[in-house]
Amino acid sequence: YPNITADFAIDAPQGWCHPVEVDFTDQSDLPSSPTPQYFWDFGNGATSTAENPTQNFYNFSNTEDSTYDVTLEVTSYDCKDTLTRQVTINHNPIAKFDIDRTEGCTPLTINATNQSTGQDASEWRFDDGSPYASGDSTTHTYDNTTNSVKPYDLELYVETNEGCDDSTDVRLNVYPEVTADFDIETPQGCAPVVTGFTNNSQNADNYNWDFDDGLTSSQVEPLHKFTNTSKHDTTYHVELISSSAFECVDTITQPVKVNAQPQAEFTITQESDL
């Protein structure tokens, strides 16, 4: 009978990262008649009698590659030959990181630590136009120049030397900046000074006024009376603390000068008769 030689080719069109669909193509040297018999043992508990089978292979490890011994046995005229080749399924890394905060007022600085497994390279992607960064940790500052909440997605991409990859991301919410500002209708005058305040604060919801005389207010634009019973001019330092519903805060202080009222005073000196 003619001599037969078992042979086959292996192809994984989608690559060798878990899970892998592998195509096996018979390339044995054997007579075409009678019809040869094929028996495939894929080394994973599965078998096949097809000439050119397809088989799925898995690797549930995140750190080590898995190798399977695939054996083809061909039979013709009761003559047999076998060939064993190895199939290696590369592991997939798992992307994971810890982050110290996911929300806050602009500028928001975050610190993230890489907790991934099985990777050979890591890449931090910031979603704000900044260049990607590598390494086991990253510190990044996010800005928000709008008047509404601005979201960013911080992504960690990891990859092995074989090209197997994974990624994970977390949503960050950066709250708008609060700017405290106000104008004083009467910044200086003779006691008493009654003045209103024009509130020019931006992105604020709550206001706390301290008039530096023991009195406070939470009105948006309060009216206040400043007194001065001394003989000297007095300056009050008015403080406005503006805050948002997101607990973003800004403070500004401006002076109100209250001049002392002049006091008329004279003395009479009795003179002798002229």
Residue ranges and their predicted role:
Residues Y1-L274:
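Extracellular/lumenal mature domains of secreted and surface-exposed proteins
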